[in-house]
Structures are given as C-alpha cells and as structure tokens.
C-alpha cells in the first residue's frame, strides 16, 4: 500500500478529516499532557505526516454529506458480530475481546477513551450490554404454547417455568411477542444460537394467509407467569389461526435504544469535527495549534477540527434582565445563565454541575427563556434519558410562557415561531399507551397528545416551534425522520447527563449538532445515580461512565487544588435550597468535599424539631437499628425484609396519627418511602394499604432521583448478608439527599457498619443521640422489635469481626465518587449462576 500526497490544501483537509489520518498521532501528543512535560511540549514543533491511503483519493464533501444523511435516515438492526457472539459464552474475556481488535487491546491497557478510539471501544462495550440483555430474553423463549383470547385483539400465553422472572425483563408497550407456527418452524428452524432468533425474521412480512407467516404483537402486560399482548388491526391473523394451533413464542425487545446508540456511534465516526468537540484539547495543546507548532509535512493547512476556535466575549451582566430575580443573589446560577447566553466555548460542551437541591432546573429554565428573549433566532432542543426529567423542565417552561407578561408581549411581536408555538413536548407512542393521567394539563396542552390522542409529529411540524422537549430515544426517532438535514437547533440541553451512558448522550447530539455554532449544554450530577447497566462486564470496562463524567475528568474541565476552573466550560452550583443543614452536611462531607452551602429557609426545613420521637431536635436524622432477615422471592433477583417493612409502616402511622408536634400535621403525600428492591417496595405498599395509608408514595432510589419529600423513610433491606447494590456510593448519595426536614434510615447496623459511608452515618447518629433501637425501659419504639442491648452486642460483634477488607460486604470507597463494579456486588445482572442456567436452557432448546 503506497503513500500518496495530494497537492491541494482543500483536498488534503478532506482526506485527513474523513480518513482520520492524524487521529492516533495527535492523541499520542495529548497523552503526554502531564505537569512534567507541558513546558517542554509547548516549546516543540510537531511535524505530522499523513498515513497511507488506500486509493489516494480525497473524500468528496458532497458524497460524504449524502452518506451522513443516509446514516441518519436508516435504522438497521445492527446484529451482533460473529466475534462478539463467540465471546459471549466465556463472558467476554480480555483475550476474546482483543483478538483482531488492536484498538480495544490498547484500551484495556490505558482505560482511556480518546478521539481516535471512542467509536470502536464504545461499540464493543455497547455490544456486551446488548448481548447480556438479549440473553435474558432468550431464557423466556417458549417452545410450545397455546394462545388464549382475553379480549378484542388481545391475547395471553402462560409461561412455563423459567430461570428468570419475566417481570424483571419484559417491558410492556415496548417489547414484542412473536408467534411462530410449527409449519414456519419446520421450514425455517430456529438458529442454534437462540439470541439470533430475537432478531426480525423474513417470515414476519409474508402475507397473512401464508402458513409460514410469523405473527408479531405488542406486549400489554406481564406477570411472573403470563404475558398479555395485543395485535394491531392491520396484522391481526384472526381467532381461527391463533386458537387453532400451538406456537413457539419468542418474547423480544425491539432494541430501539441500542440501535439509536449504534447509529450515533457510526455518525460520530464520520464526524471528526464533533469528535474534536467532545474531546477538547487541553490548554497547552490548543496554544500549540494557535502558534502553528503542529504542522503537516508537505500539506498546506491543518484540518478544520484541529484549527483554533475564536474566543467569545461575555455579555455584560446588566444586559440580562432575569425572569427569576432570586438568581441575582446566586453567583453560580447567574454565571451559568450569562455564559450560555453569551455563547459558551466552542472548544467543548458547557457543563452545569448541579448537586442535590442546588437549583439546576431553575438555572436551565432561566437560561432557555433568556435565549429565546435575547436571541429570537435561537432554536432549542431539551432532552434527557427519562420522561420525568423532560416533564419537569417542560412544565416549568410552560408555566413561565403562559403566565409571564414580559414573555407573552415579546413572543406576540415575533413572526416566527407563532405565540402559541413556543414549546412542544413530544411524547412517544409508548408513553401514550401507558396513559397520560399523571401529566399536568398545561403540559398536555403543549404536547403532541393535547387531545389525549397520540399525534405523530413530522419534522415539518417540529420546525415551527422555538423549544422542543423530548427524551433521547424520541430525538433518535426525529433524526430518522430527517431532522438533522435542516441543521435547525442552535442549542442542545441534555439534562440528567450524569445518568446517561456516553452512547445514550450521543443520541441527542449526533445528527443534530452539525455546525460549530450549535452548542451542547450538559446538566446533572455524576455523583448521583448513573445509567442502569445490566452487564457487570460492560460496566467495569467503562460503559457506566457518562459523557459528563469523562469530560469533568479531562484536563480542560479539571478543578485545581485552589478550586479554580475554566468558567467558559462549566459552572459548579453550590447552594442547597432543599434540605435541613444537618442533612446537607451529611452528604456534603461524604461526597462533595464540603463544597456545598446549606441555604434553605429555616421555616421550610425545621418541621420536625418538635417531634416527640426525634431524640435531638437539632439533628433530624434517625438511624433505626433493626435486625431483620433478608429473603428473596423464588425465581427473582429482588430481596425483601419483613421486619424492616413493619418498622417503616410503624413510623408512617405515628407520623400521620400524631403529627410533628405544635399542631403540625403530616399528610400521606408528605412522606416518601425509599425501598431499594422491587420486592420490598411491593411488600411495604401492601402493608401501607392494609393500615389505611395508600397514598404514601413507595419507590426505588431511582424513582426519587431528582425529587424531594419533606419526610423520607428508607429501608436498607440487607441484613446479615452482602450489601448488594446499596454498596454504590452514588445510590447512597441519592438516598441521603431527598429529604427536606426529616430522614429516617431503617437497617441492620451489624451489616451496614462494614460500608464506609454507612459506618460514618451510624457514628454520626450515635454522636448526635439519634441512633435508636428497642430496649427495656427506653423511649417508645416499635413494640414488635426484639429487646436488644445494642451497644454491648455491637461492640462484641465488632471486636470479633474479620478484618474489613476480608469481609465480603465491606466497600472501600475511593476519594473519587466513581466506583467500578466489583465481582462481589450483586446487581441486577447476569450472574454466574444465571449464566449457567442460560447455557443449559439454550442447549436444550437448540437440540
């Protein structure tokens, strides 16, 4: 393969950009960016020569644009490669992953995502997660089932015994049931690797009356033993076919989110300018580019993605008249608004780091409205991984737009968009199927379901609005509808960015950001819950890290020892307006290096100071010692603790019946129950309903992320067992930071003291006199708890315990919040036992 150089500078630039001729060399320069080398590097001039090109021809920009548009429009199924399928049985060992993959082999050594390897590495990690998810669906395959009619177009099948709980795997309104007649099975048997049977088959598209036709329906409901599904009118085969024979039933995911992520990575591979933006150069390297100390041998110019970007001047603060005047007194919030409105750095995404209760949503809402006021031509996309995050921002925007006189006058004077088309909340069809009862009327009015009927909005409709709010997956659908072809949006706001994997965040960027004047703003907190990853292997290799987290660890975004950082790239919110100062102090010292400042009004957070059951009125945190037993339901990964559930309900009854003292009543809506396991949540819900408190909200830690309640009562469930996923410091951080006025933790201290963070919490509660347990002659506690001489038993067990590092449930937390999944951590994932069951099941079905 010969080396060919083009003479034209323009042609050289295109060849370099598309074929990534400098990727690896440039990244090598960036890797030496440590303190000992920076001065030396600044004085050097790097001469970079082009790599060999197969045919020596530059990539035509018109053809490249056509290829990008084709990528956006199409959404292939992205079946797993043969190499990845072969690596699955051995759980993706290093050897399997690095065979014929030099890029990933290097990544395993460095554990660094770079400009040149991000697409290849992320595709590998995403495939591991994809296959791990498909494994669970493969276990639900039913070789011979009868279909039972339950209503018009609605049917069900009864599941035979499986090693997984269908409720833990199958998603109603999103997943599908494929009914395969025996005639179709004979003509086209299932593949030996049953994971491939989860992909669409050609026989699904035959004529209805074809005996080999496979019938596809949408899952309606799922329980441990049954799956209910519904056909559309266009593909209903009729009762005579469905109830007259047995079927092989395949329960599968459409894999739509995975397919959007695969496509985003493909688009990123084709877009060096966007990759340059997502991997910003450190300051010393940018200076070298400015000073032309990086040169191309025999070439006329640097590629555009290496060229220096113009600096942007800040808009004077007096030019911004805030809609929410409270932001004037919050230096960090005001800084974020001014910086984004002025135009954040074009070197990389702008980050609003918002710890719990610091007003992140308030800041983002104000910024979006100021952009629409001061930059009428701006068009804004607001997106997040969850519907709840999208709804929160969209509702606050709608409230301002509908009630603020200044906004209404301003929008009335604009020709485009029209006053009634300032914002559109785009719901997915699946959300419409689930029901819109919980969606506020104002938000519903400004959505594609305004008449309680789902309306599929085309791109031409979206282009009529100033602000579009949609989940990341819905943005992926809009990209398929050619939204990217219009280069429409000037700003992309990704909320809860710390809770999305990097490929997930890319769904909201790729196909949308195609020019340097489209700004990306990431808001969130990477120290709270991240993305849910089913594969421990994928998580440990880096899939669990968010784009936001990676950027904050890079040189450009780092905070130095004196607390200084580049304010053109980020704002760090500090002032907590949610919780009692002692509650803030608890999670502030554990997770935020004491950077947060408690500023909630006393009247809002001192509600429990006169409560009879609070031993210390100045410290509204109780640790209720409970020595229950952790149990697990059959065929389920979820745990429950009967005694802790009873204790939770006892506290609820006392709070509602007795109030908080001095006439302060407590409603059911004031209390939030956090049950980290689904089984515990179901048990607590049942007990609360039986005692007449059905409106007390019970949810997981994930349910409460981004939310708050005056009173939070949490059951930690794990007792005389390993900590399970409660070992995660991010999970504990969310748990501690939801309560405004009162936090009650119910758990087993003997188990929890082996966890660094819970050990600290228990110690603090003991010091403050709020560590409580039942013993004779003491203050009233749940009468069903056994009498325990807690101090003596705890001291004895402590002195006789094993060394902490040898204890299975001990968690040594690093100073950095990010924790790589340990083999001992029992998350909802494919465990060793489950993997064996999968192998056996697949072997039996393929015989």
Language-model regions, residue ranges each:
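Pre-ATPase regulatory/linker segments immediately N-terminal to the P-loop/RecA-like helicase/translocase core
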Residues: 6-74, 79-88, 92, 151, ...
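Conserved P-loop NTPase motor core of helicases/translocases
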Residues: 12-20, 323, 377-492, 531-542, ...
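Eukaryotic intrinsically disordered and solvent-exposed regulatory patches
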Residues: 162-166, 214-216, 323-324, 337, ...
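Phosphate/oxyanion-binding active-site loops and adjacent basic polyanion-contact surfaces
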Residues: 167-178, 328-333, 356-364, 389-390, ...
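Pre-Walker A (Motif I) flank of P-loop NTPase domains
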Residues: 345-352, 377-378, 466
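Walker A/P-loop
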Residues: 346-367, 706
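Walker A/P-loop NTP-binding motif
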Residues: 361-376, 396-399, 510-511
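Conserved helicase motor core of SF1/SF2 NTP-dependent helicases
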Residues: 386, 473-475, 482, 487-847
């Amino acid at each position: 393969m010969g080396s060919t150089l083009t003479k034209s500078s323009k042609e050289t630039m295109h060849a370099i950009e598309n074929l990534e001729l400098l990727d690896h060399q440039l990244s090598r320069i960036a890797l030496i960016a440590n303190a000992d080398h920076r001065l030396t590097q600044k004085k050097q001039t790097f001469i970079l020569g082009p790599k060999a090109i197969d045919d020596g021809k530059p990539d035509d920009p018109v053809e490249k644009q056509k290829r990008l548009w084709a990528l956006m429009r199409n959404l292939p199924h992205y079946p797993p490669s043969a190499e990845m399928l072969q690596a699955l049985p051995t759980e993706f060992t290093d050897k399997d992953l690095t065979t014929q993959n030099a890029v990933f082999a290097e990544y395993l050594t460095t554990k660094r995502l770079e400009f040149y390897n991000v697409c290849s590495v992320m595709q590998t990690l995403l495939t591991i997660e994809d296959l791990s998810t498909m494994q669970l669906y493969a276990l639900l395959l039913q070789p011979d089932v009868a279909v039972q009619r339950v209503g018009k177009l609605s049917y069900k099948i009864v599941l035979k015994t499986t090693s997984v709980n269908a409720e833990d795997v199958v998603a109603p309104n999103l997943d599908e049931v494929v009914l395969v007649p025996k005639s179709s099975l004979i003509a086209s048997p299932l593949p030996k690797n049953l994971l491939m049977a989860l992909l669409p088959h050609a026989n699904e598209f035959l004529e209805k009356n074809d005996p080999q036709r496979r019938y596809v329906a949408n899952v309606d409901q799922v329980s441990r033993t049954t799956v209910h599904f519904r056909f559309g009118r266009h593909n209903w085969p009729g009762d005579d076919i469905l109830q007259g024979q047995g079927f092989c039933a395949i329960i599968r995911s459409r894999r739509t989110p995975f397919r959007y992520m695969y496509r985003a990575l493909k688009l990123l591979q084709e877009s060096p300018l966007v990759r340059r933006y997502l991997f910003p150069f450190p300051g010393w390297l940018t200076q070298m580019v400015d000073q032309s100390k990086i040169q191309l041998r025999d070439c006329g110019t640097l590629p555009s993605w290496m060229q220096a970007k113009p600096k942007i001047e800040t808009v004077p603060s007096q030019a911004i008249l805030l809609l929410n005047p409270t932001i004037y007194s919050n230096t960090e919030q005001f800084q974020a608004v001014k910086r984004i409105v002025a135009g954040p750095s074009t070197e990389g995404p702008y980050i609003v780091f918002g710890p719990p209760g610091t007003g992140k949503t308030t800041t983002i809402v104000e910024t979006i409205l100021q952009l629409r006021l001061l930059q009428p031509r701006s068009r804004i996309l607001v997106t997040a991984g969850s519907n709840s995050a999208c709804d929160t921002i969209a509702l606050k925007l709608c409230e301002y737009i509908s009630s603020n006189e200044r906004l209404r006058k301003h929008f009335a004077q604009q020709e485009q968009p029209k006053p009634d088309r300032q914002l559109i909340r785009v719901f997915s069809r699946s959300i419409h199927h689930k029901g819109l009862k919980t969606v506020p009327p104002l938000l519903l009015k400004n959505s594609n379901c305004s008449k309680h009927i789902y309306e599929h909005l085309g791109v031409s409709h979206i282009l009529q609005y100033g602000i579009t709010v949609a989940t990341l997956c819905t943005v992926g659908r809009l990209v398929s509808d050619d939204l990217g072809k219009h280069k429409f949006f000037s700003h992309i706001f990704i909320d809860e960015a710390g809770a999305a994997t990097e490929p997930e965040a890319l769904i909201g960027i790729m196909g949308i950001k195609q020019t340097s004047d489209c700004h990306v703003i990431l808001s969130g907190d990477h120290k709270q819950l991240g993305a849910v990853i089913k594969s421990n292997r994928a998580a440990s290799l880096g899939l669990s890290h968010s784009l936001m987290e990676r950027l904050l660890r890079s040189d450009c975004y780092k905070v130095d020892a004196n607390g200084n950082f580049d304010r053109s790239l980020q704002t760090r919110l500090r002032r907590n307006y949610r919780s009692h100062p002692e509650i803030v102090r608890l999670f502030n010292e554990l997770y935020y290096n004491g950077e947060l400042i408690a500023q909630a009004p006393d009247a809002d957070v001192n509600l429990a100071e006169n409560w009879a059951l609070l031993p210390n009125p100045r410290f509204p945190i109780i640790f209720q010692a409970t020595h229950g037993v952790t149990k697990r339901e059959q065929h389920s990964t979820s745990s429950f603790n009967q005694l802790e559930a009873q204790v939770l309900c006892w506290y609820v009854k006392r709070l509602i019946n007795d109030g908080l003292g001095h006439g302060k009543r407590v409603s059911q809506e004031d209390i939030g129950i956090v049950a980290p396991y689904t089984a515990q949540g179901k048990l607590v819900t049942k007990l609360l309903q039986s005692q007449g408190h059905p409106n007390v909200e019970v949810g997981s830690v994930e349910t409460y992320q981004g939310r708050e309640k005056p009173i939070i009562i949490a059951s930690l469930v794990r007792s005389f067992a390993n900590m399970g996923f409660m070992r995660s410091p991010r999970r504990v951080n969310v748990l501690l930071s939801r309560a405004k006025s009162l936090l009650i933790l119910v758990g087993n201290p003997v188990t929890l003291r082996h966890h660094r963070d819970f050990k600290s919490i228990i110690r603090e509660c003991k010091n403050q006199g709020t560590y409580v347990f039942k013993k004779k002659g003491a203050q009233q506690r749940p009468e069903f708890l056994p009498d325990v001489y807690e101090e003596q038993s705890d001291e004895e067990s402590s002195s006789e315990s094993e060394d902490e590092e040898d204890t299975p449930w001990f968690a040594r937390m690093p100073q950095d919040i990010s924790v790589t999944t340990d083999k001992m951590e029992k998350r909802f994932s494919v465990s060793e036992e489950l993997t064996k069951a999968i192998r056996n099941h697949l072997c039996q079905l393929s015989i």
